[in-house]
Amino acid sequence: MSQEFAHLSVLLTETVAGLNIKEDGIYIDGTFGRGGHSREVLKHLGENGRLIAIDRDPQAIEAAKQFADDARFSIVHGGFGQLATYVEELGLKGKIDGVLLDFGVSSPQLDDAERGFSFLRDGPLDMRMDNSQGETAADWLARAEVEDMAWVFKTYGEEKNSRHIARCIAADREKTPFLRTKELADLIARISKSKERNKHPATRVFQAIRIYINSELEQIDQALEGALTVLAPQGRLSVISFHSLEDRMVKRFIRRHSQGESVPHGLPITEAEINKTRLLKGVGKAIKPSDEEIERNTRARSSVLRVAQRLEH
């Protein structure tokens, strides 16, 4: 891999430590990326251990060839939202000792202008995680109604000026369609009312479009629920999120399954029966990167790690 597109895995030591790896365990890296977390997991596994990686990016599948000679490693080309399906097909449901999920966009994806994720590098307005299928960001911007764009920008980007930006995009595309990342980023910078320091005005809109195009929040929801179904008793879940939408989903998921089902007052249900509906327990507090890690890798700044453990029943 070129130095230009090198990738530093975020919270690497903390995330793998959260898995509490057993030498002969079976683990899932649901977001392989360029293999940083997988490499660290393999270091902790014995010869009878097993690691199954998942990624929908064809470039990630290519990068996985670095582990081709390691019999403990295999990779599935697909979205992490379908991890439960892949595990069931392998006959391993309820036998997984740990699931690792990193919801960040990898540095090679961001830095490769041709992928269309970056507002700092000009390239085709694509943004697909799997660029072999699906609608591009340019295609969507060409057809989306103002109301739909405004909803996406506000819901997935928490953009306060969502309607204003959507109207300006709709007006400008009548003259020239948006085909390049720089065209969109320049428009947003020109019309933006944002006063956020150290943040490009297009940050939230680009995030929102990327999340929408790739159905990221739906994938996250499916992955979390899927992890719960495949984990063995005492199996661990280590999850890294990068913005508040993702982190809220993870936090609420762990809390919901740690508290168990709510029961209407007065029903003749025992505490033991309620406890059976508690499927997870949180492990420690949320972990954020150290100042030293942020200095090495500024993209780690917004990351948050949460760890949970599958209960016995």
UniProtKB/Swiss-Prot annotation:
Q: Does the keyword Methyltransferase apply?
A: yes
Q: Where in the cell is it found?
A: Cytoplasm
One Pfam family from the UniProt entry?
Methyltransf_5
GO terms for biological process? Answer: rRNA base methylation
What is the protein's known function?
Answer: Specifically methylates the N4 position of cytidine in position 1402 (C1402) of 16S rRNA.
Q: Which reaction does it catalyse?
A: cytidine(1402) in 16S rRNA + S-adenosyl-L-methionine = N(4)-methylcytidine(1402) in 16S rRNA + S-adenosyl-L-homocysteine + H(+)
Q: Which family does it belong to?
A: Belongs to the methyltransferase superfamily. RsmH family.
Looking at the UniProt record for this protein, which Gene Ontology cellular component terms does it annotate, in alphabetical order? cytoplasm
Where is the chain membrane-spanning? Answer: none
The protein's UniProt keywords, in alphabetical order, are: Cytoplasm, Methyltransferase, rRNA processing, S-adenosyl-L-methionine, Transferase
Q: Which GO terms describe its molecular function?
A: rRNA (cytosine-N4-)-methyltransferase activity
Q: Which residues bind S-adenosyl-L-methionine?
A: G35, G36, H37, D55, F80, D102, Q109
Name of the featured protein: Ribosomal RNA small subunit methyltransferase H
Q: Which PANTHER family match?
A: 12S RRNA N4-METHYLCYTIDINE METHYLTRANSFERASE (PTHR11265:SF0), S-ADENOSYL-METHYLTRANSFERASE MRAW (PTHR11265)
**EC number(s) given by UniProt:** 2.1.1.199
Q: Whose protein is this, by species?
A: Shewanella woodyi (strain ATCC 51908 / MS32)
Coiled coil, from the record:
none
